[in-house]
């Protein structure tokens, strides 16, 4: 059929529809492939990380709507299974193994024992005595709310947050909100975790890199001071310094009272650090000695066997551990270097991002094991400065990670929202990262 294109409506409708279809298809392909950009290629390269982002955004939104943390993370676990296509049977097996794994059992056991010890100390008034002794020694609520959690933080157990939280609650009173108290207790309790060799992550990092433990601890001292200062400037200065108690007239007697009130914690720490005794064995031993030295009776402590086992803590522990193991199963953490390597920034910052994101997703141990040797091989002149930088990145990321069980326990202790804790922590670690970057550059000038 011959067509006259000069006449209006000369093209039959069926040809017009065909031409329109071709145009739409062409337009569609231009959307998919515009100047070399392909959505298919983009999804292949970044799809796994988009899924990860969606999971964490969903958790944040759920927390915003006051969904309990266990429920929000539980839904996050379900989304992980759905988005990453983990077979249902496999996901159930992962969940089951996670619930009965040695790591989960040890966390629950240590939390139970520390809570049991806390109940005993409260019954004998030793936590209150520690507060009064600190108040008389320093006459400062701010010292009580910061130094006490740091000391308790020497104990490498998630359950230590309960004792730290109790002391912060008493020291801060009604001068700050319970959300602020949650931050103060969690933040200062975790500062020792950033540099002390009582924590397995520090030991593992030194073993993998060959950096001397003493050199690392010395290199971390300025950053520890920075953490203390930032915590004070953001929140502790809201608390009045004065305790309302008379200044000490006998410092030695007050120091003895402090030692008498906290000797149980000190002995557990010494057993762990000096003799390498497992936390649960050290705690059981101290509880037995404490029972006799403080003349407890069976009637006094028998209720603690049940009250120290709190259902919500058990549930939260199971949910967090399952979520972390499901994320680890996706292997998304192993693809992080490919995501950040093309960024136009120095290599140490690339690995800083990898460690930050990887720690939020899978925790410190996983990212240290997988990526620390890679970082030391890729960054020229790697040594103590790089380890200080990367371990600080890991530490800071743990303070906002939903896979960090201690944060969950802190929120449970104060009955606060996890999102509120993250909101208060982000500005602090943001400034910490800026200072840390400058400190790394400075260290490289001398080491």
Task: Tell me what each language-model feature is.
Residues 34-116, 129-133, 265-344:
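Hydrophobic transmembrane alpha-helices of multi-pass solute/ion transporters
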Residues 201, 216-229, 359-370, 376-447:
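C-terminal transmembrane helix pair
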Residues 78-88, 142-147, 252-261, 310-323, ...:
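Small-residue-rich segments of transmembrane alpha-helices in multi-pass membrane proteins
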Residues 237-262, 298-307:
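Flexible interhelical linker loops that connect adjacent transmembrane helices
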Residues 143-208, 383-420:
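Alpha-helical membrane segments and immediately flanking helix-loop junctions
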Residues 110-113, 135-167, 343-395:
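Hydrophobic alpha-helical transmembrane segments of multi-pass integral membrane proteins
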Residues 68, 106, 118-125, 153-164, ...:
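Short helix-coil transition sites and intra-membrane helix breaks within transmembrane domains
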């Amino acid at each position: 059929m011959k067509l006259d294109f000069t006449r209006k409506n000369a093209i039959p409708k069926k040809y017009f529809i065909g031409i329109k279809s071709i145009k739409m298809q062409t337009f569609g392909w231009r959307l998919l492939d515009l100047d070399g950009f392909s959505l298919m290629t983009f999804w292949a390269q970044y799809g796994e990380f988009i899924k990860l982002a969606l999971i964490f955004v969903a958790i944040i939104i759920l927390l915003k709507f006051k969904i309990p943390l266990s429920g929000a993370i539980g839904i996050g676990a379900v989304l992980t299974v759905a988005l990453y296509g983990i077979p249902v049977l496999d996901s159930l097996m992962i969940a089951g193994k996670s619930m009965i794994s040695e790591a989960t059992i040890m966390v629950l056991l240590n939390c139970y024992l520390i809570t049991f010890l806390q109940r005993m100390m409260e019954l004998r008034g030793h936590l209150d005595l520690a507060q009064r002794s600190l108040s008389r020694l320093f006459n400062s609520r701010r010292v009580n709310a910061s130094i006490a959690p740091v000391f308790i933080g020497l104990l490498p157990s998630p359950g230590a947050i309960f004792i730290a939280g109790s002391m912060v609650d008493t020291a801060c009173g009604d001068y700050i909100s319970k959300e602020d108290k949650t931050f103060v207790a969690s933040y200062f309790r975790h500062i020792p975790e950033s540099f002390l060799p009582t924590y397995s992550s520090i030991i593992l990092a030194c073993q993998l890199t060959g950096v001397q433990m003493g050199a690392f601890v010395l290199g971390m001292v300025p950053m520890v001071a920075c953490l203390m200062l930032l915590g004070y400037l953001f929140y502790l200065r809201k608390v009045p310094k004065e305790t309302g108690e008379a200044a000490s007239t006998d410092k030695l007697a007050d120091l003895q009272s402090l030692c008498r009130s906290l000797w149980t914690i000190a002995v557990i720490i010494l057993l762990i650090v000096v003799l390498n005794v497992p936390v649960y064995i050290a705690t059981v031993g101290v509880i037995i000695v404490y029972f006799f030295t403080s003349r407890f009776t069976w009637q006094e402590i028998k209720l603690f066997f049940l009250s120290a086992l709190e259902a919500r803590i058990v549930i939260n522990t199971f949910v967090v551990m399952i979520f972390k193991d499901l994320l680890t199963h996706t292997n998304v953490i192993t693809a992080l270097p490919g995501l950040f390597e093309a960024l136009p920034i120095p290599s140490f910052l690339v690995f800083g991002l990898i460690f930050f994101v990887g720690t939020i997703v899978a925790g410190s141990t996983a990212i240290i094991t997988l990526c620390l040797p890679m970082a030391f091989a890729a960054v020229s002149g790697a040594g103590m400065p790089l380890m200080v930088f990367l371990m600080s990145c890991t530490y800071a990321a743990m303070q906002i990670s939903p896979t960090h069980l201690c944060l969950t326990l802190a929120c449970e202790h104060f009955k606060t929202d996890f999102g509120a804790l993250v909101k208060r922590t982000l500005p602090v670690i943001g400034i910490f990262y800026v200072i840390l970057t400058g400190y790394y550059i400075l260290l490289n000038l001398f080491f």
